[in-house]
Amino acid sequence: LYFNNFKELFIHFYGTVVKTPMKKQVLFGTLALLASQAFAQQAAVTGPDSRLKLDFQLQDGKPVYSVTYDGKTVLENSPLGFVSNIGDFSRQMSFVGQQADKVEKTYTQDRIKCSTVNYSANKLTVTLENAEKKKLDIVFQLSNNDIAFRYEMPQYGETACMVIEKEATGFDFPSTTTTFLSPQSDPMIGWKRTKPSYEEEYVPDEPVATPSKYGEGYTFPALFHVGDNWALVSETGVRSLYCASHLSDATKDGLYSIAFPNPGEMNGLGSSTPGLALPGATPWRTITVGSGLKPIVETTVPFDVVEPLYEPSQEYKFGRSTWSWIMWQDPSINYDEQIRFIDLASEMGYEYTLIDGGWEKNIGRDRMEELFKYAHQKNVDVFVWYNSNGYWNDAPQDAKQCMSNSVARKKEMKWLQKCGVKGLKVDFFGSDKQQMMGLYEDILTDANEYGLMIIFHGCTIPRGWERMYPNYVGSEAVLASENLIFNQHFDDMEAYNACLHPFIRNTIGCMEFGGTLLNKRHNRTNDGGTVRKTTDVFQLATAVLYQNPIQNFALAPNNLTDAPALAIDFMKEVPTTWDETVFLDGYPGKYCVLARRHGDRWYVVGVNAQKEPLKLSLNLPMWKKGETVSYYLDDKKRQPQLEELKIKNPAEVKVVIQPEGGIILTK
């Protein structure tokens, strides 16, 4: 409960304020003191439109919070605080004070779902004190649909550092909640002991508190359907100063807690508990809430509460790239076939090509320099793949031992800069420990000094990194396109997974999927291997559906002649950066329709994972009555068609999306 003043609180508990004989004033004075103490240990904050509300209180000395939206419970009383090596901040806490404030800012940001963000939030800082009189601030910021909160600690006398041994931070969902979660992997499993790498399958609409596959809990972001509302839980602002976290398995009552990395990650090396210098702060934990999925898909909270850590050394340019490895695999990493993919990039008008793992042995550094020169002659720039590992997994691909320490890394980056290379794709991280977060940051900061962009693969999710690091241009952290080559199961599930990512993984940041596969069969000659189940227009739609500023598309030279001309023409023009994103319709795992704007051109794309054609009426206010737009669709035989569609009523644009098919409307 939240009360505006002491009188309101007193009346709630005791019915009325009455005049009393002197004898009874002592009793009422005692009751008033108890009520005053209760009032002093509660606080609340709402979003600017008052629909989202967070209540804070101390329950028997333990800090807890709860969340409602439109008066309906999203989170029941959930614990806060932590235990550290210098004191317990999760119990025996006392209320010291509270302070309210407002946060207003407008910022521009490339590489995310929109280019200009207006952030307005109400801020509440609650100051507590533990049994040893050590203070702790819990800072909450609420915008209309987003909550961000973190812990801020001062220096305690001469104690200028601390280790957080365990967080009490939790998220207690009502028992009727269903979940859309991906399990956290066991450490040191999978191919060459490279997990966890955020590449596990989601289970949709699962009952809350279902045990996770590995017993390690669930990765961020985590989506919850809470009655009439939806909630997305994640974190942002993680860098070298903390570990990355995930959710524990839930209690039977639906309480998920913040969990630190398994000690076995990184081959058992490095601490799984984070250390901080004081004064210091934890990362922001975020909760996005709405009565529908629109606030989830459109959220910018990962970027709203963080700031750039350094200036870009140059103006980084984003765009499209070819990539031989995805369709032609390891044998394609040779000089002659890289020439073919440079030529493909040139023919498509793409900005980049990616030379993948194995180049050091199969091509060699001298001939790599020749490739770089050839690419530049064709007006194509180059990304080069690197293995991140030093001593934490067995991944064999080269180039190895170039990114894991500063001396080797700077030497390598100096060579790449000299050769005119524009970026790196660094693979096989396999841990969320603070030491690994430091490696991510070191790679990014060193790369900026040499004018290099960075894509991470086999990695953790980004946590506000697009805003924090100006040369960061993508993370995999998803069951990406390579799995379509490896196993037919993932082709069978492709449409379903595509209808999850816009609601979960891609909501919180870049997702380097490496998609848009126009081969019917996933091998070099388009006549063997796994079979694509989705339509050509579905594949084209994912070029817009999946958001990442550098898109390594899975096209091959043969597609210039064996793919439909309309598909190649579309892929020559599709952009990779967006000024605006609008969610239109959908349900996780079933279908998704959204719109993105690049400059003054809109792209409305939809995909359908269901077994029947999907008829929709879309509200498309970006176009006026009488306008004509290009309409890509599948016919009943699943063949791609390009038509001109005249907008009769922008509020009711009728479309049909075929099973495992797609649509695109653009102008």
Tell where the protein language model's regions lie, with residue ranges.
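Bacterial Sec-dependent N-terminal signal peptides
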Residues: 1-42
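An acidic-aromatic substrate-binding cleft motif
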Residues: 277-352
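N-terminal accessory beta-strand-rich subdomains and adjacent acidic, glycine-rich linkers
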Residues: 42-298, 302, 639
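Aromatic- and carboxylate-enriched substrate-binding clefts and catalytic-loop regions
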Residues: 354-535
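Carbohydrate-binding surface patches
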Residues: 587-625, 663-666
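C-terminal beta-strand-rich structural cap/linker in extracellular carbohydrate-active enzymes
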Residues: 645-667
